Amino acid sequence: MNKALKGLGIITTIAMLFVLIGGALVTKTGSGMGCGRSWPLCNGSIFPALTLESIIEWSHRFVSGTSGVLVLALAIWTWKKIGHIRETKFLAVMSVVFLILQALLGAAAVVFGSSALIMALHFGISLISFASVLLLTLLVFEADSKQKSESFYIGKTMQFHMIGIIIYTYVVVYTGAYVRHTSSSLACLDFPMCSTENGWLPGKFHEWVQMGHRAAALLLFAWIIAAAVHAARQYKNQKRIYWGWMISLILIILQAASGIAVVYSRLDLGFALAHAFFISCLFGILCYFLLLVARYRRQVQK
């Protein structure tokens, strides 16, 4: 397989990660209006004034635009080069369509303004584009290996975990994005409960938003542990499934730890960006599991 195509896949995947982290940086630093109501220009000019907010917002737009070109190039190239692989064309379309959607949503928020409910979708839409690019890149590397042609087994319980967890993870991601866009990150200053001084249950809207996300994340944490234990017991000989769940377990632990650190560090930017990074990586792996389930079901039907 063309080494240049593999290189493009890796670069595009990393670029999309920067888009996700950059979006989180914009939100965490309150830089969403750093370029005013102007788009694609920044305060009516190509280059922004030298303020922190405008530089962060302009940089995010620049990285997103560059990533858009890379995603389009990867989609076209993989379509031509490995279009015979069943998932390629679907993923190519998904990567481009959802990247355009997230760009339009971001632009609309700048020009017209938007509610927290709508803006919380921005990160989730970007996640789908990132996962599509990641899977496209994996297909490129897979085309040179024998893994795709190997038969494998996924039982009903594991299929339930793989499908259920990816859907539920997307819900949890939305609640986390809603926490950011409603400025609820520090609504509860203790952990695991909201406050040991004013009672353990939340009393205000922002506290309910924060605790709702924590409750949803706790269930996801427990579910991934259960799936990882099942994989360790039943799928140790199937490396993709076994190691996929082991890595997912590590990522969800890091995700939880960074979330707790955000609270106790009083919104340290490094921990906040790590929180976005870990969930992005986890979502990518879970989407790969979804790909495996689809392949297994086709394998059974043959």
UniProtKB/Swiss-Prot annotation:
Coiled-coil residue windows: none
Binding site for heme b: 213, 275
Keywords: Cell membrane, Disulfide bond, Heme biosynthesis, Iron, Membrane, Metal-binding, Oxidoreductase, Transmembrane, Transmembrane helix
InterPro entries the record matches: COX15/CtaA_fam, COX15/CtaA_HemeA_synthase, HemeA_Synthase_type1
Active site: residue positions: 57
Listed GO MF terms: metal ion binding; oxidoreductase activity, acting on NAD(P)H, heme protein as acceptor
Top-tier EC class: oxidoreductase
Residue stretches spanning the membrane: 7-27, 62-82, 92-112, 121-141, 159-179, 209-229, 243-263, 273-293
Source superkingdom: Bacteria
Coarse class of the protein's main subcellular location: membrane
Gene Ontology terms: biological process: heme A biosynthetic process
Extracellular side: 28-61, 113-120, 180-208, 264-272
EC number: 1.17.99.9
Recorded topology in the membrane: Multi-pass membrane protein
Catalysed reactions listed for this entry: Fe(II)-heme o + 2 A + H2O = Fe(II)-heme a + 2 AH2
Cofactor: heme b
UniProt subunit comment: Interacts with CtaB.
Domain remarks in the Swiss-Prot or TrEMBL record: The N-half (TM1-TM4) and C-half (TM5-TM8) domains are connected by an intracellular loop. Each domain is formed from four-helix bundles and they align in a pseudo twofold symmetry manner. The N-half domain is the substrate-heme O binding domain and the C-half domain is the cofactor heme B binding domain.
Family: Belongs to the COX15/CtaA family. Type 1 subfamily.
Known role: Catalyzes the conversion of heme O to heme A by two successive hydroxylations of the methyl group at C8. The first hydroxylation forms heme I, the second hydroxylation results in an unstable dihydroxymethyl group, which spontaneously dehydrates, resulting in the formyl group of heme A.
Name this polypeptide is given: Heme A synthase
Record organism: Bacillus licheniformis (strain ATCC 14580 / DSM 13 / JCM 2505 / CCUG 7422 / NBRC 12200 / NCIMB 9375 / NCTC 10341 / NRRL NRS-1264 / Gibson 46)
